[in-house]
Amino acid sequence: SAGHMQLHHKGRLVIGVENTPTWVFDAMKFLVIDLGGTVGQIGKGLHGTAFEHNGVKTGPAICYEGLYGDFYGGFVRRGAQFMAIISNDGWWGDTPGYKHLFSISRLRAVEHRRAIARSANTGKSGFISARGDVGQTLGWEQRGVITAEVPLNSELTFYTRYGDCLARISEYILLLSVLYYVAYRYKRRNHLVK
């Protein structure tokens, strides 16, 4: 939109670097190494915001936000037709870490049926289809420009609609099962049950 700036405030901060309580940070300054970013407690947004340009809505996930499937789905629930992930993967070095982040992006594409354009300053950049297929990519510290036709999708998957509800239900069932087992063992030990 001409003349209108759209903002997204990162909603999921990197624990230990972007999200460290000040009392911990002050006490442990001697352990902190400079990774080229901000260290300490920085502000964060509440949820993903979909940007709109020429009638197309994009979900602009920043770095670690792509690790949280339900949070990531917030972009889609707010209308994102495709996702754009920007990331600073440089602090991983040439380790499997940056490759793992790219793989997680593939999982998010499948969960929400959204194509992804991922741009990492030193890590792996590329295009991922809504099925998780990888298109053109640039590898570790590889400079270049890649382009692709990015299909748009407005339909919501079950996971996008309901998020982690199945996982939460499973957690409650497990908790109730453990409590039942403990109560049963207690009653049995005290000869209250035959």
Question: What does each model-found stretch correspond to?
Answer:
Residues 1-166:
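Soluble catalytic domains of enzymes that build or remodel membrane lipids, polysaccharides, and related
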Residues 161-186:
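Selective detector of the "anchor" transmembrane alpha-helix that sits immediately C-terminal
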